[in-house]
């Protein structure tokens, strides 16, 4: 019965777009927790396994977790402007995420400068500039094909000169296996010395997002991830795989098309959405959450 239920849980996780390596790691942790443990009085093996699974996944998502807003506040006290660099392949919603983060900070009374350092993608500079105008941020830019690192430097210098609080640098995202892209990003990173590097991944990309995260992590050592399009039909298991593959947390998630649709990534609520159809909802009660 034990192995049969474990096999069902494995299928559930794989169908949720969680990668094989992360699934194996979670099931291995479950086995180590369960072997030798006494069964509940009613002998309810299924419930015990479900609760252990939720606990294991929650632990995985909380590895190295940090709170976005608190971190910004701490950094502002130490050394304004706070510099945030966004990285990720094209099509993940990186530029829109830059605008959403800016909007979030502006709503809290902070001043934001956007650095249009994606000088490669057609329309990227205009897109970011349009967002900046709508949300009340300044945008520092150059012509298409310009020096990305110089744009980042100019944005930071401009923020320092005007006393702005935060600089958000949007970067190019041609496919992650292009060496020249990675060299360009390393140059931007070296020049900008960002306080925070965020990887932007698409919840719909599944295991492709995990591979992208792994490659960006090997080059830039990002601090956390933003998972976009979490409001879609994506199961979202990629979040678990990204956290496992990079040892970095998902800190924010895109939850819609509007500027305000950027939420703190909350592991337990994410897991209830991911698993509540497949496992006993009472398994979430260890966190005081009703998954009904």
Q: For each of these PLM feature ranges, what is it?
A:
Residues 54-59, 87-89, 118, 172-175, ...:
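Short linear motifs at secondary-structure transitions and domain/linker junctions
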Residues 279-292:
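Extended, compositionally biased non-globular segments
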Residues 31-33, 94, 100, 121, ...:
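Basic side chains
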Residues 14-17, 194, 289:
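Hydrophobic transmembrane signal anchors and adjacent membrane-proximal interface regions, especially
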Residues 1-117, 124-144, 150-169:
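Primarily NTPase-proximal linker/entry elements flanking Walker-type ATP/GTP-binding cores
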Residues 127-128, 147-161, 174-281:
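Conserved catalytic-core segment of NTP-binding enzymes
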Residues 20-22, 121, 231, 259:
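Short hydrophobic/aromatic residue motifs in ordered secondary structure
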């Amino acid at each position: 019965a034990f192995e049969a239920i474990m096999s069902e849980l494995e299928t559930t996780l794989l169908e949720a777009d969680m990668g094989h390596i992360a699934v194996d790691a979670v099931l291995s942790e479950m086995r180590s927790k369960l072997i030798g443990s006494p069964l509940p009085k009613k002998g309810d093996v299924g419930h015990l396994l479900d609760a252990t699974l939720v606990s294991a996944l929650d632990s995985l998502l909380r590895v190295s977790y940090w709170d976005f807003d608190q971190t910004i506040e701490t950094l502002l006290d130490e050394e304004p402007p706070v510099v945030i660099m966004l990285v990720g392949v094209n099509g993940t919603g990186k530029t829109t995420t830059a605008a959403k983060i800016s909007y979030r900070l502006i709503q809290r009374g902070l001043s934001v400068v956007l650095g249009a350092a994606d000088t490669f993608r057609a329309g990227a500079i205009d897109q970011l500039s349009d967002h900046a105008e709508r949300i009340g941020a300044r945008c520092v830019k150059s012509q298409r094909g310009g020096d990305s690192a110089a744009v980042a430097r100019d944005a930071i210098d401009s923020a320092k000169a005007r006393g702005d609080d935060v600089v958000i640098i949007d970067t190019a995202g041609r496919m992650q296996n292009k060496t020249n892209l990675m060299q360009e990003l390393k140059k931007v990173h070296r020049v900008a010395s960002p306080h925070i590097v965020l990887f932007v991944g698409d919840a719909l990309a599944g295991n492709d997002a995990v591979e992208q995260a792994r490659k960006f992590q090997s080059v830039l050592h990002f601090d956390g991830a933003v998972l976009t399009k979490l409001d879609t039909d994506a199961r979202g298991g990629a979040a678990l795989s990204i956290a496992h593959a990079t040892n970095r947390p998902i800190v924010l998630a895109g939850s819609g098309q509007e500027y305000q649709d950027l939420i703190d990534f909350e592991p337990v609520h994410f897991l209830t959405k991911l698993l509540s159809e497949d496992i006993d909802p009472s398994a979430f009660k260890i966190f005081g959450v009703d998954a009904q």
